[in-house]
Amino acid sequence: MLLRLALSVLPIVGSALAQAGGPYVDPDNGITFSGYTDPVHGVTYGFVFPSVASGSQEFIGEIVAPLANQWVGVSPGGAMLNNLLLVAWPNAGKIVRSARYTTSVFSSRSVAMTGPVLTDLPSSKVNSTHWKWVYRCQNCVTWTTSSGPQSIPTNDFGVPAWATSTVAVDTPSDPQSTFLEHTDFGFYGLDFSQAHVSDDQYAIWAAGGTTGSPSPSPTTSTPSSTSSTSSTPTVVATPYDYIVVGGGAGGLIAADRLSEAGKKVLLLERGGPSLGSTGGTYQATWLKGTNFTKFDVPGLFETMFSDGNPFWWCKDVNVFAGCILGGGTAINGGLFWFPTYNDFSSGAGWPASWNNHGPYTAKLKARLPGSDHPSTDGKRYLEQTYDVASKLLNSQGYTNITINDNPDFKDHAYGYSTFDFANGKRAATISTYFQSAVARPNLTYKQYTMVLNVVRNGSQILGVKTNDTSLGPNGVIPLTPKGRVVLSAGSFGTPRILFRSGIGPSDMISLVQNDATAGPNLPPQADWINLPVGYNVSDNPSINLVFTHPSVDAYENWAQVWTNPRPADAAQYIKDQSGVLAQASPKLNFWRAYSSSDKRTRYLQGTVRPGAASVTTVYPYNASQIMTITAYLSTGITSRGRIGIDAALTARPLVNPWFVDPVDKAVLIQGLNDIVSGIQNVPGLTLITPDNTTTITDYVNNYDPGSLNSNHWVGPCSIGIVVDENTLVKGTKNLHIIDASIVPSLPVGNPSGTIMSAAEQAVAKVLALAGGP
């Protein structure tokens, strides 16, 4: 059914389209678009193409936005990096626009894309409430950037990306104006195969003509099996003792230990395989002939953020989150620290019964010892930044240690970066716990299966509802009579499942209630469970300092390792998984404790690596000699945020957790000043971001708030607040959480090791509960 679009009825269109695109007619020009209206910001995105048979390289598009959206961008190819990005904004009653692409997720800078030809069509306009850009985009279906050829899937289903900002661009009259990073972004599904009309009709619209609704042109696409409403035989669902939702660090440990105990376990992962050993196939060209994927090779970590086909990121979470086997541990830098005593102390928010983490960390260490020299030849490579940084730190009284041999020594301590890699490849919980779990006949693993909500009768969980109707009637998978569900979907995924299950604050559950698809699956309002899900959220505020030193090899800033690595290094890695590519970019880590005005002790962690995400300086510099020190504030911070969902049910931060308490900011500024205070003790070391035209304080005060994100989110389902000491969700009889969301405060280092140790302890407590299964 076609939807009639008018500026005054945008909320109606948004409600109708939800998160999947559909056809509508623009009444100003009669063009039939396939599009989507974001219900949060009220922005509509539309596309229409000539016939598939024409093989045309153009389309007509439109953006309709309320004036509150100072600029809007859309990427029909479905990614922000190395993809066509069309950006527009109103200025003096007219539309200013450009075709661009971005090269780094760490910078809001974009560059003009040569090739696309944009023509504004007559129905573009600005009025008192909205602005509308209707355009013809020629040479816009395929393009080539440094990551290779890209294209819009014009005869298939696609996932366009959008971005918007409430902050105006720097120079509104300039189509190539710079601007700050978007204040929000997202994705939606669109069947491009249905977005075509006849060539004659398209030609009329492209010339600025108007007409009524046309007949869509024939396409060669086949119907999607997921949209069929035909009658099918009733599926008989298999009940399980435990259903583990999510194949990240916590979920894989839980599934392994539960199945090891002889329980009948179902492990569900919404994404697909990662490592080659798990069925993953996404390879760089130079890896062809091996079984190594992008996720196996540690040296490809930096390319996770610059790939034109980043299918591993969750499309319904507006921060980086891994929707792939292994979750965040499949795509992060692999830094791996055994927890300190304080990480599980009562002062850090843990129940007293959790204080002795030692036996559980020992179990973790037996399975995953980690290494600060993961290359199979035992050597370390590209260590110039280690040498430079160690001189800087030695001058400030730091001690060089083997970090995981001294986990409680975290003040004025530094050492080689330690990773959860093994045999020169990424390991984490994927090649350890997962491999032993799936080898057991009592564990069933299903990938590409998304859990929407738990099915419950009051406090009793009966099973889970998924998107896979082959697993049970309407996708519902039941528990055995004494069974339990373990949510391990991460700090954004787990809260959303709870909201969709009627568990959490009423404002979040009400958003679910108003959703046409999710609302009917809620329990009766009398059975809603009011818990502070989403509150008490922490993440490390982090700031990058960029230096140059003549001894440093920036390794082409990691820009060539995917498409054109140094030949000798590629050959060495393929031969025996040794060399530069057998470890990720970090080379050194350090910690320092700070007392502060509120009498609390806060810890600063530093990570040193060759290369830099972005450089801001008025002076010339040698890009082949750049290195970065990232300073994070961790244990002891008091700032907290909130995680929730919006009207589209996209998971997102509702309140950012960085610098809510000004004391946190003051301590981080002090730490940065201390780091740079020793520069004169290292001949040749130059700070270029910030350079000498900016003070550290001004640099921090003007730092892009979105760039403070370290993506180390913990706490939205904190133990003692949302779950009890046995990880049981309060108000339920058999729903548990084992993931980062129960961690009540930030550990002193990157959280993966602490999360894994917590998972070992949590699953032991679950198995010890009376009442089974």
Where on the chain are the PLM-derived regions?
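Classical protein tyrosine phosphatase
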Residues: 69-86, 252-291, 342, 350-356, ...
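Fungal secretory targeting signals
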Residues: 1-25, 486, 739, 773
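Extracellular-facing/secreted segment signature in eukaryotic proteins
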Residues: 19-218, 222
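Residue-level detector of alpha-helix initiation sites
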Residues: 248-249, 380, 384, 492
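Conserved redox-cofactor binding core of oxidoreductases
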Residues: 341-453, 461
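N-terminal glycine-rich phosphate/pyrophosphate-binding loop and immediately adjacent elements
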Residues: 233-346, 351, 510-512, 522, ...
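FAD-dependent oxidoreductase catalytic-site/capping-region signature
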Residues: 349-404, 578-754, 762-773
